[in-house]
Amino acid sequence: MPVNNLTNEMPWNLTETVAPSVEPITTVEAKLHLRVDHGDEDAYIDTLVAAARQYIELVTRRSLVNTTFTLKLDAYPTEIRPPRSPLSSVTSITYVDTDGNTQTEASSVYNVDTDTEPGRISLAFNQSWSDTREQNNAVVVTFVAGYGAAASNIPAALREVVKMLTAHYYEFRQPVISGTIATKIPMHIESLIWMHRVLEAP
């Protein structure tokens, strides 16, 4: 029996399986914004750009560049809302059937709505989800989220925020830990980031 709400009714786990192939801004773009004209810190600047992207993605619940995720659920909800936006595509939905075997749900069973934010995966007309075994992580949704494979597809406002946050990290050099930095982010940058937060999370 499907449940109505993914977050409130069941636990879920999200894992990044394929990282973005590019960062939102290049090393050259970052150095131009920072007014750095030497190459001694290129690797360090690249690390700061990645950290800025990761923080922005965490707060906004977005993926700036196409990234592949797996979403694990204990059962099928009535509607699946992948917890990263914008939803680009659904690669597959697999499930553990009542005999304990892993099966792939036919794509004809569900519709993928990439226009709504967050995106939605819902049953097609006159279809139903397959029966699953009662166990943890019985349903696995593999999907791609992001504005595209190229940085040029990212909205200009978000690219500018990446530059601003990278500049803040560069000016206040603190250890980079899991995409975050210890120094408090200025209010104007934080406000710009929160403006892009997906309001309705799954």
Regions of interest found by a model, annotated:
Residues 1-202:
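Divalent metal-cofactor coordination and adjacent catalytic microenvironments
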